[in-house]
Amino acid sequence: MSSVSSDIDGPPETKRFRIDVDTQVGIDTPSVSTNCAPPVAGEASQDGQSPAAPSSASYRSSNSSVISSSESPIKDEDVDVHDGQDDTEDIAMDVSGSTGSIVNNSEIFEMLNKTFGGVFNCDLEGIMRPSALMHPSSPPTPIQSAGIPGALAVAQSPAAQLFSGDDWSWHRNPAASIRSGGTNKQTPVWKYFVYNKTENLSRCIVGDCTYMLKGPHTSTLACHLKKHTREYSEFQKLKTEYSRTKLDQQPKIPDGAPHPLTLQTQNTPRQTGSPASTCNTNSNTSSSVSSGSGIGSGSGSTMDLSMKKPKKEPSSAKLNEMLFNGLRQATNNSNGSPPTTPHAPQLPNIPSFVTNMMLQMNPLHMMLAQSLPGATPPTPTSSNAGLNALQQAGLTLAANGQIIQSKKWRNDDKKQKELCTKFALALATSHVDFEVVQNPLWKEVFEMAQPKFSIPTESQYEHIVNSTSHKLIQSLKSQLSASKKLNLLLDITKITADISRVTVSVALTGGAGNSYETQVILLAFRNINGNQSEDLTAVFEKVLQDYNISPSSINRVICSGLNELAEPAELPKQMDSFSSRLANCFKSWLETSPTVEVLKKNVYAMLVSYLTVPAAIQLASQMLKAKFEVPLTEPFHVIVEHLVAHRDIYQMNMEGITLISEREWNKVTGIHHLMNIFKPFMTYSTDMTTVDTVIPTIVQIQNVLEKDIYHLGDIGSDLLTSLKQTVAPIMNPEHENFDSTYIQATALNPQLAVTLTSDQMTTAKSLIETEISRRTKKMRKAQSDKKLAMGVDSLLANVMRKNDGGSDGGCETALAIYGDLFQSITGNSSESKENIVNQYFDEISSTTSVESMFMLRTFGNPMQAPLSYWKSCSSRCSELSDLATELLSIPIFTLTAERVLSFSPDSSSLNTNLILTNLDSTDQFEKQVLLRFNRQIVSKLFN
């Protein structure tokens, strides 16, 4: 009892320390009521640690020591260090033992949150907080604050005021803080150096030393101080005293009370400072804590202080160990096992998503899955989600189950995203299932090509394809809405007797300067439910609705393959493609010409004879060094190409083989020559061919046939007759089905207009004048229907009445005042539109080339590209320029299914197997085809 009474009679005598001030001011420093001395800073510095030494302001705001009012000085040697350290260790062990599970789990979640970048970003206080019924809440004792012993006094001393703001010589007091840059453990070095801020130089003031350093770098100055042995030894002692870290005060925990960590969110608002452990140098501190009564429990005269060591980043092995310990602790609590400490609070159930994530991170913990509260066995989907979370954080699982740094790119890395996009699009546009990626050989290929690349999952693959397809559709809609007139291309391809495919595309004209070009964009590749014209019309209207295309914005609908339907279809502004007309002309000639029919019989007889002689097939294979096949079932134009390519084989004279004559070989060669002439105009090509080139092409073909008719004989004459019948609606204005589009387009091309005859030129001029007059009247009517604001219409009516009254002077005065208003109604120019058309035809129909070069031109340079030429003339006559642009942008062919489905530009055969295998997924197949054909637009979406 005597010892207890001596403890409660009053606080022990406080020990004080002082700091020697080297300036001319002597001030007794206030004392701190504490018996807990910190560890020697010299030992900390020798161990490689860096004690914190913040500025005086931050130091004062966070310090929790109590300043005594005693003024009696005492020596520094009176401070008892060893007793305080022993008691500190005892109490720290006691507190940590009672709250070990709480701190352990809080550290686990804190490490997980740092490691996985916010994956475990949850309310840890809610998880770690025990029930309020388990422990009565007791508010913590208010914490008092005080300044730094000596530092505040020196900073406010008259001696410090004698120095200017840019003079750091007053910092030679080791306890004072640097006014302009904060403090660190090297601050006492300013006792031996002086810094001038104006010169940015630090000078040594030890003896006669002339050392100077640019800048106030304390570490470099401390290295120089090693040359002065006595001063350096003194500097080490000063640094040891100055390197004391901040001490946070924490009230004592009564018996049965919860740890302050669990009460932080219940009783006090959240603070930026972290809670600290407690210590006391009194010999009976342990007993007072356990009994709940002591010196510090009822009053704030003495506070418990401890050293807070900086946290170190946990290693992967430590992280796995802590995860395992946390799961084991939770398992013990759920099974009813006795806690390791007698008064440890019970840990509540961990949320299931946190437990499942912890299980997915390390396979070694999965054996605890059945006993974890709220946990469910991990599925392959959840395991993949956990691995994806690791990959997103730049981590991975090692073979032993440890979480290590990943060598692969993060999921949000730019290169990883680019390669994932290209890989997904390449896989989708090749019409290959994602299951092919499960082949280990593919993983080996990617691992060798780019080890840092991670193959995307199936969900990521689908997301990339769907999002890119959506972006493509939106981009196409914006391009279509920006165009005034659209030329739609429609082609019908018959796959089987009951399966047909329609290909809808659009030809857009764009460019600048002299580089105008027409681009073909695929819009749809869809199935026709029947072979009636209504089925085609329904599909066409659905495409227009999907892309928000108004019928008024359609210039022409170029069609091909309509003969595949049972009934002829009628679409708005429909126009048959010239390429399909020319192809039908050539094919009908091969099927109906009597001369070609006789040649066919002889050629088929020769091919059959080769099939009956195996030795001939074997010899042909030896000559080709490959298997030789006879194309007996192919169309005749394919057979002609085959015969010309292997003429030496079919001229072998062997027993049992029927050969054709030399004259017939000449006919075969002539047919092949004609095929080469027609072929560029019958198939799709990347070089856009427009309708203004049709008439010059027809004239050229006719000239070739008339020139070579002597060598071709009846074959040439039959083809010439068939060609004239086919092109009659284009060339002859007197034909009942005459299409004036070709003549007008050719006349509006200043380079090809000379190929027209005088009759054709006159017809084209008359048609163009009529169209321009119609458009001008339509524009004036639209302008007159608009009511002018602010009474301008009545003002204009007065002007027009003065003009009709015959008063020339009044009319001239009115027009002089309201000239712009009058021209806005009557026309932008006084020059007649018909006169502009006549002037254009006069310029392009000059007699000689020399005259054409030196004559004064008002429309531009005729050597420009046609679209560029009319773009430059739009200010002269907008109606004529718009008409020319519309006609000169109409293509002569359509985009066929063969071209859409071919992977190589040289391939011309239809891949029917690709269509038949995707009959059940037509929408997905169309999406893939659009991405592949419009790959140039897709590439611009990611630039």
UniProtKB/Swiss-Prot annotation:
- Start and end residues, zinc fingers (BED-type): 184-235
Compositionally biased intervals (Low complexity): 50-72, 277-292
Q: One GO cellular component term, please give it.
A: cytoplasm
Q: What happens when the gene is disrupted?
A: Defective cessation of distal tip cell migration from the dorsal muscle towards the mid-body during gonadal development. RNAi-mediated knockdown of cacn-1 in mig-39 null animals results in a strong overshoot phenotype in which anterior and posterior distal tip cells. RNAi-mediated knockdown of Rac GTPase, Rac-2, in double mig-39 and either ced-10 or mig-2 (which are also Rac GTPases) null animals, suppresses the overshoot phenotype in mig-39 null animals.
List localization entries: Nucleus; Cytoplasm
What tissues express this gene product?
Expressed in distal tip cells and in germline cells.
Q: Which UniProt keywords apply?
A: Cytoplasm, Developmental protein, Metal-binding, Nucleus, Zinc, Zinc-finger
Which BP terms from GO are recorded? negative regulation of distal tip cell migration
Specify whether Nucleus is a keyword of the entry.
Answer: yes
Going by the entry's taxonomy, the superkingdom of the source organism is recorded as Eukaryota
| Pfam families (alphabetical) | Dimer_Tnp_hAT (PF05699)
User: Can the keyword Cytoplasm be found in this entry's annotation?
Assistant: yes
Q: Where is this region: Disordered?
A: 1-99, 242-315, 328-348
Which stretches does UniProt call biased (Basic and acidic residues)? 12-21, 73-85
Checking InterPro entries in the record gives: HATC_C_dom, RNaseH-like_sf, ZnF_BED_domain_contain
Q: GO MF terms on file?
A: protein dimerization activity; zinc ion binding
Query: Which residue intervals are annotated with compositional bias (Polar residues) in the record?
Result: 262-276, 328-338
Q: What does this protein do?
A: Regulates the timing and orientation of distal tip cell migration during gonadal development. May act in parallel to cacn-1 and Rac GTPases to control the anterior and posterior migration of distal tip cells.
Put simply, this protein is called: Zinc finger BED domain-containing protein 39
The species this protein belongs to is: Caenorhabditis elegans
